[in-house]
């Protein structure tokens, strides 16, 4: 749940790389929720992509597959609360920041979390502003995934 600032606000961070395009990097900020992402279940154990075992209490079972994976390294309650506070803090600094559109709006309209967190052409092309995830603008990314606690936090913004 610790927030780390990587560079000053007045600098442009090309946080989406070559695939993400310049337009969206210019008009967006990047926040990274640190974890190992998807997990592979082998027997009754769960493993990260680097073959490190994850204890069951740190496993999020979505109950469905998101980007081909059902099991994920869970975000902690502290991470989700820190993210919520950071989003609200950034909204205070940047009043034009759009929290009404993007993933929160889709979730509030009843779109299934799996779909709300998927690639969105309008987000990718910077045609629809709002709160998005790496997965909204990159087909090769796995963060963020729709963990129930994260979904509920975003719906509550």
Residue ranges with predicted function:
Residues 1-96:
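Active-site-adjacent loop/helix surface patches within enzyme catalytic domains
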Residues 3, 12-14, 104-105, 126, ...:
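Generic preference for hydrophobic/aromatic residues in regular secondary structure cores
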Residues 113-157:
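Short, low-complexity, polybasic intrinsically disordered segments
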Residues 42, 100-101, 105-109, 125, ...:
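Polar/charged alpha-helical tracts
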Residues 30, 97, 150-154:
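Generic hydrophobic, helix-prone segments enriched in Leu/Val/Ile
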